[in-house]
A protein has these predicted regions:
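Pro/Thr/Ser/Gly-rich low-complexity, intrinsically disordered linker/stalk tracts
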Residues: 1-27, 64, 76-120, 165, ...
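Intrinsically disordered, low-complexity N-terminal tails
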Residues: 34-39, 50-54, 69, 73
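C-terminal, beta-strand-rich globular interaction domains
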Residues: 144-149, 157-165, 176-180, 184-191
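Short S/T/G- and acidic-enriched coil/turn segments that sit immediately N-terminal to beta-strands
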Residues: 53-58, 111, 145-159
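An aromatic-rich alpha-helical recognition segment common to small helix-rich domains
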Residues: 20, 33, 59, 68-72, ...
Length: 195
């Protein structure tokens, strides 16, 4: 069972997505999804939030900053229910607040990006694009800091290229509670122009 919380302002998306391995039993009817705010819980009818036929569920009845814990069971035609799965938890973080550069601001080719810390975030990733919706050109590392410097982008092989003067670029920050920077929340998008 895997749970990933997401708070993505651009998509007006606040949810925790649950995925698990399918049960191969011939008489399988579906799955029951249980949720609690306590890590060690026993699946009971008062904690049942959904019955689904496929091994995926999107929980949209969540609040930002609350950790939710989930277990899933399988049930068959005779209404026999399996034991609860290994638990998983998800958390939708508050949106990162971008500090600079902000819309309309001039920046150097080695732009320093900064944002306010997000409670619960373990890492951040800055995404720089050539349009509001596509054209990612950044390859900055994950950071636990609330600043990052754009030193250049890789264009071919290992050669680095700076941001181009007089061009407008867009940026956002992804905050994560998981290893590898899986997105839990994505900031609004700001733009800036390179001097």
């Amino acid at each position: 069972l895997r749970a990933v919380g997401r708070n993505i302002s651009l998509l007006d998306q606040l949810e925790i997505a649950l995925d698990w391995a399918a049960n191969g039993e011939a008489d399988l009817v579906g799955y029951r999804v249980y949720r609690s705010v306590n890590a060690s819980f026993t699946p009971t009818s008062d904690l049942l939030i959904a019955e689904v036929e496929t091994p995926r569920y999107i929980d949209r009845a969540i609040e930002v900053g609350t950790s939710y814990y989930y277990q899933v069971t399988a049930f068959d035609r005779g209404n026999k229910e399996s034991a609860g799965s290994v638990g998983a938890n998800g958390l939708a973080l508050p949106l990162p607040e971008l500090v600079e550069p902000i819309t309309g601001q001039l920046a150097s080719a080695q732009t320093v990006f900064s944002w306010r810390p997000v409670s619960g975030a373990l890492s951040y990733r800055v995404i720089v694009t050539t349009s509001p919706t596509s054209g990612e050109i950044s390859d900055m590392e994950l950071t636990a800091d609330t600043t990052a410097v754009f030193n250049g982008r890789t264009v071919s092989g290992s050669s680095q290229e700076a941001l181009e003067s007089s061009e407008i670029y867009y940026w956002k920050v992804i905050a994560s509670t998981r290893d590898g920077g899986v997105e839990n929340s994505v900031s609004a998008i700001e733009n800036f122009k390179v001097r």
